[in-house]
Regions:
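Substrate-binding cleft of extracellular glycoside hydrolase catalytic domains
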Residues: 1-126
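Alpha-helix C-terminal capping segments
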Residues: 82-85, 120, 178, 214-215, ...
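Short, low-complexity, charged amphipathic interaction modules
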Residues: 220-244
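Flexible, glycine-rich phosphate/dinucleotide-binding loops
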Residues: 39, 67, 136, 164, ...
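General structural signal for secondary-structure boundaries
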Residues: 17, 68-71, 105, 109, ...
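Catalytic domains of cell-wall/extracellular-matrix polysaccharide-remodeling enzymes
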Residues: 90-174
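Functionally critical loop-and-helix segments that line ligand-binding/catalytic clefts
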Residues: 1-11, 16, 24, 143-225
């Protein structure tokens, strides 16, 4: 089984020293928050530029604020632009976890999740869902993850066991949480991790999926669009793009 260690970040982590991250021999990937709803994360410009510069493989995640199908479709189209611009090797992830979302009920939530996955998946990016044990058990229909071709949309599963250590490789100390959902592609095992280069606590993850195989690409694609080209693509949506 593949085990790759990574973190996920947003504006909450402040200014990150990406050179220190790049020197960490255990860090295999970073999942960057790209947006909340259809508003770009305020730290995204710097984070994506630095991920590209330091050649750290990355995924993107999108925090939802929508409660209607029309709203989720707009968020998905917004996310698709990021995916087409930046080709995230570790997937694009939909994070729907607010109280107003839970109030929608299982059937509606499942419909919204599935719609986002379908739209973003059309870009060729591996589109998945970030969620926790309670939502999986009570608020998401299992069929959400099933594709028509028999494959599955990947799951990024958050569950925090009682682990004393908080470094990247400490997840091995208690794998029972991961094993409770063996289909999880990524397990987020703590929100209190510490890593050189980031001054705050940070979420830490273990990836068990070969995303290069899912997308048909090498882990690090041979070609990206340039940062300038990506900025132009994002400007079509009225966002700032990448600050050079």
């Amino acid at each position: 089984m593949i085990e790759q260690y990574g973190i996920d970040i947003s504006t909450a982590q402040g200014k990150i020293d990406w050179d220190k991250l790049a020197r960490n021999e255990h860090l295999a990937f970073v999942i960057i928050r790209a947006a909340q709803g259809t508003a770009q994360d305020s730290a995204f410009d710097r984070n994506i530029k630095e991920a590209l510069r330091t050649d750290i493989p990355f995924g993107l995640y999108f925090a939802s604020g929508a409660t209607t199908e029309e709203g989720v479709e707009a968020e998905a189209r917004f996310a698709a632009e990021f995916c087409e611009a930046f080709h995230p090797q570790f997937g694009a992830w939909f994070d729907m976890e607010l109280k107003k979302h839970a109030a929608l009920g299982k059937r509606k939530i499942s419909t919204l999740l599935r719609r986002w996955l379908e739209i973003v998946g059309e870009t060729g990016t591996s589109a998945g869902v970030y969620t926790n044990r309670n939502w999986l058990k009570n608020l998401i229909e299992p069929a959400v993850f099933e594709k028509q071709d028999g494959a599955r949309y990947p799951l990024w599963y958050a569950a925090y066991p009682n682990i004393e250590g908080r470094t990247l490789t400490d997840a091995w100390k208690d794998n029972r949480q991961k094993l409770s959902y063996p289909q999880a592609a990524i397990w987020q095992w703590t929100s209190k991790g510490r890593i050189e280069g980031i001054s705050t606590n940070v979420d830490m993850n273990v990836c068990y999926e070969d995303f290069a195989a899912l997308t048909g690409e090498d882990e690090t694609p041979e070609e990206y669009v340039t940062v300038e080209e990506a900025a132009r693509m994002l400007s079509n949506l009225g966002v700032r793009g990448v600050i050079l």
